[in-house]
Amino acid sequence: MKTLSCIFLLSLFCGQAHSLEESSFCKALVPGEYILPAEDGTWTWCMAPIYDEKGKLHIFNSVIPKKGSWIKHSKIVHWVADQPEGPYTFVEDLFSSDDASYHNPQVSMAGDTYVLVFLLNRYRDANGSKQEVGMATAKSLDGPWTESPLNPVIPASGEMNGCQIVHASNPTFVVTPEGKYRIYYKSMTDKLPLKKGFREISFAESDQIEGPYVNYEANPVISYADQQVDIEDPYAFFYEGMYYMIVEDRRGVQNLLEGNPIPADQIRNGGYRPGLIYKSKDGINWGVPEIGYQTNEIYFGDKLARSERPNILWKDGKPECLFLACHDEDPTAGYFLKIKNWNVE
């Protein structure tokens, strides 16, 4: 990633910056619907969708009391439906605790095991309320789900580039072609104070689903921290012989790469801009992204709101829908976009 940063800066100096292209993935996206309206007194966030072996759709998402905060009071709940449009039936509060926050789930299947990864904040313990990565597994989407005895499977500790890791969250789980297990996640170090730090993408790998997970020695694999912009909310997958990663452009990476960086005091943090999609042969060297998805304003004609937390719903080994969390004026978990005839390049 350091090499990529140097190449990028050199290209700016040489006047070679170009507009990011709209990806073939983005071109395949068709508006769906807003779903899962929040109940009174709560707000909802993020949707992790998956079909079971009988074709029933399951969604895991975060529910937070309006009088609380996601950092301390988020829980992961479980819904089912026959189709992405719904209607949805509440199943259960899957993970909820007075001592921890469970947030931003992502669900996958590895062999005969369902894997749920999530942000875990055990705010009552001695670690200073650090955000870390948790995992739970089950043989059925209906449970029982078992939290990993190794939780947090990726702690907010250790060293990265000579700095201390102080944050690990928003994970996405991938099975590699070699049969190993990777968790890509948002990382931050103490290179700068936490509130001034910039989000990077790192990964850890294991020979077993449950772990232990070992951080890649050359983390982070995607970073623009030196340019004081960042990305987050990775959703990674391996498809048609390539790794892909869809992310939220949190602070104007697109503008930076196009040679027109937004002044720091004018950046509006969050998913108020199109998301990005990266492609890689090895899941380590990611290169320059393309536009991965547009905003809710483009898809629905609504007032611009934060579109974040991309998650793909897969059917018969192919991507069917892209789900996005959205903070709009109507309190829903977000919306989905149909993926029609994606021409993988």
Q: How should these model regions be labeled?
A:
Residues H18-E345:
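Carbohydrate-active catalytic/glycan-binding domains of CAZyme proteins
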Residues T3-F13:
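Sec-dependent N-terminal signal peptides
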